[in-house]
């Protein structure tokens, strides 16, 4: 059984990332302002997700998933719906693999375009949702 808890500094480094996300960890996860959560299964961190405030009214949604996490994606998506539902303004996210795009679309994000050679030389799709 998995459990949801508030994100703590360092949690992002405990996720054994899916192969598609290898190299995606960035230090900003621990210093970002905004709501974030961690998912554990049997005491092992399997996913982290949250919003990072860029400036007033603009946020960056982020998520890190382990190879075990797809079974938990529905639960992560439900938790992110609650976080996003309380946030007004523009929320952006990027996706570098199809499962991430499906995850964002399930959250109501719309694809705005493709950013070529965006991170680690890979193309990323830019997604956003805007709420007032």
Regions found by a protein language model. Name each.
Residues 1-27:
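Short amphipathic alpha-helix that is part of the acyltransferase structural core
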Residues 26-29, 62-63, 75-82:
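Acidic/histidine-enriched, beta-strand-rich ligand/metal-binding domains
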Residues 32-33, 49-57, 112-116:
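A conserved beta-strand-loop-helix scaffold within acyl/acetyltransferase catalytic domains
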Residues 38, 43-53, 59-60:
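Conserved beta-strand in the GNAT
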Residues 55-68, 125:
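Conserved acetyl-CoA binding element of GNAT-fold acetyltransferases
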Residues 61, 118-132:
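C-terminal "cap" of GNAT-fold acetyltransferases
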Residues 70-86, 102, 106:
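Conserved acetyl-CoA-binding loop-helix of GNAT-fold acetyltransferases
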Residues 87, 91-105, 110, 118-119:
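Conserved beta-strand-loop-alpha-helix junction that forms the acyl-donor binding cleft
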């Amino acid at each position: 059984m998995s459990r949801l808890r508030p994100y703590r500094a360092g949690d992002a480094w405990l996720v054994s990332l899916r192969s598609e996300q290898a190299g995606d960890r960035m230090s900003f996860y621990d210093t970002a302002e905004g709501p974030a959560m961690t998912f554990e299964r049997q005491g092992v961190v399997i996913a982290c997700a949250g919003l990072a405030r860029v400036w007033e009214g603009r946020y960056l949604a982020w998520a890190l998933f382990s190879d075990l996490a797809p079974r938990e994606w529905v639960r992560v998506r439900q938790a992110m719906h609650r976080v996003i539902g309380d946030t007004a303004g523009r929320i952006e996210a990027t996706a570098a693999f199809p499962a991430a795009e499906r995850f964002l679309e399930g959250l109501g994000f719309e694809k705005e375009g493709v950013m070529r050679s965006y991170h680690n030389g890979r193309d990323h799709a830019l997604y956003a949702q805007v709420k007032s």
